[in-house]
């Protein structure tokens, strides 16, 4: 038994069919594009951490005010 109940021979047949359908040139370019995308993602993640500015916490403010009761409108029956 191989991966998930699939034998090595079945995996090789699937790989052969994929190569025959897409061709080696297209698979090579697809792998290259995928690798470039992963490198770009990692680079942007590293740059995001390095360039992240320090976040300043807003300072609390105290407001001096007096509470007063607001008149409520008369209820209509």
From Swiss-Prot:
What InterPro entries does the record tag this protein with?
Answer: TatA/B/E, TatA/E
Origin superkingdom: Bacteria
Topology relative to the lipid bilayer, per the entry, is: Single-pass membrane protein
Alphabetical keyword list: Cell inner membrane, Cell membrane, Membrane, Protein transport, Translocation, Transmembrane, Transmembrane helix, Transport
Question: Carries keyword Nucleus?
Answer: no
In this chain, the stretch annotated as Disordered covers 46-77
Q: Which Gene3D superfamilies match?
A: 1.20.5.3310
Basic and acidic residues composition bias: residue spans: 46-59, 66-77
GO process terms (BP):
protein transport by the Tat complex
**One Pfam family it belongs to:** TatA_B_E
Its annotated compartments are: Cell inner membrane
This protein's assembly is summarised as:
The Tat system comprises two distinct complexes: a TatABC complex, containing multiple copies of TatA, TatB and TatC subunits, and a separate TatA complex, containing only TatA subunits. Substrates initially bind to the TatABC complex, which probably triggers association of the separate TatA complex to form the active translocon.
Q: What does this protein do?
A: Part of the twin-arginine translocation (Tat) system that transports large folded proteins containing a characteristic twin-arginine motif in their signal peptide across membranes. TatA could form the protein-conducting channel of the Tat system.
Full protein name? Sec-independent protein translocase protein TatA
Q: Which organism is it from?
A: Ectopseudomonas mendocina (strain ymp)
Q: What is the lineage of its organism?
A: Bacteria, Pseudomonadati, Pseudomonadota, Gammaproteobacteria, Pseudomonadales
Coding gene?
A: tatA
């Amino acid at each position: 038994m191989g991966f998930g109940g699939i034998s090595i021979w079945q995996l090789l047949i699937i790989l052969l069919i994929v190569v025959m359908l897409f061709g080696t040139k297209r698979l090579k370019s697809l792998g290259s594009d995928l690798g470039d995308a992963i490198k770009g993602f990692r680079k942007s993640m590293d740059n995001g951490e390095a360039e992240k500015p320090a976040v300043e916490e807003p300072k609390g403010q105290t407001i001096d005010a007096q509470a007063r009761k607001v008149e409520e409108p008369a209820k209509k029956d």
